[in-house]
Amino acid sequence: MKALDYKLLLALDAVMQEQNFERAAQRLHITQSAISQRIKQLEQQFAEPLLIRSQPLQATPLGQKLLAHYRQVRQLELELAGEIAPDEPQAPIRVSIAVNADSLATWFLPALAPLLEQHPIELNLLVDDECRTLDRVREGQAFGAVSLHGQPLAGCCVDELGEMRYLLTASPAFVARHFPAGLTPAALAKTPAVAFDQRDDMHVSFMARHFGLEPGGYPCHTVRSSEAFVAMAEQGLAYCLIPELQIRQQLAQGILLDLSPSHHLIEPLYWHRWVLERGLHKQISQRLISEGRRALQPG
């Protein structure tokens, strides 16, 4: 294989970041035809497409590998520059991390707060379901991910963080209105629940396993916000699975009730990141591992 031309990889990265050839050209201060030519040269070098010209633009599997490699090298270069010339003003280091909404709403930001106060960091948080966050690392969009999958990707390493415990919860008024006779199948079939999105099978699998309810057999809101789950439960709008870590105070004060004390959902969480980490990225991993293990239940 010919040596990689990082000027061409820079063009590929710019196109994917901007999702537009014209804006990518403006970012690199070159013409649109020049950036198209660089992408073409790179595709000719590997004799296969690297971009899927769709909306949004997507990288092919090979394109994802090249982007992941380029972004790792770029991050290492930025951190090395800071180590070589620590007294010179350094541009903020952009750190992309894929994280699930429930971790973001509970332990994740407190874990990173000291580093954000001490270092010039630009966080780019890619929030997704814990089943899918690892895809962002695979596609080269993030250097690390909080995921429920324990198997590392090629070129990555993984550490167990702990387990997140979910409770089926609702407000006392909601329970009195909808479940006067308990969580019966008839009551559950007409009572609104909440899921993260249409691909979130956490609530679906929980209800099927413990109450025999099939998908689509009951009303269910979709809300892509962990904080909104809590708000909807507190306001008596729905019942839902919420991390115990997120609602300890509400449970202690009786604002929310555990609807099914004998049935809880336990999800393991892992921290995945590039093997080639150093400097600030290594500090980020150390903070997430130590604070994740402190906040979550041992696996």
From Swiss-Prot:
Question: Residue ranges of the HTH lysR-type domain?
Answer: 4-60
Arranged from A to Z, the UniProt key words for this protein are: DNA-binding, Transcription, Transcription regulation
Q: Locate the DNA-binding region by residue range.
A: 21-40
Instruction: Spell out the Pfam families in the cross-references.
Output: HTH_1, LysR_substrate
Gene3D superfamilies, A to Z: 3.40.190.290, Winged helix-like DNA-binding domain superfamily/Winged helix DNA-binding domain
PANTHER family per UniProt: HTH-TYPE TRANSCRIPTIONAL REGULATOR ARGP (PTHR30579:SF2), TRANSCRIPTIONAL REGULATOR (PTHR30579)
Assembly notes: Homodimer.
- Briefly state the protein's biological role: Controls the transcription of genes involved in arginine and lysine metabolism.
Q: Could you say which protein family the record assigns here?
A: Belongs to the LysR transcriptional regulatory family.
Tell me what this protein is called.
HTH-type transcriptional regulator ArgP
List the source organism: Aeromonas salmonicida
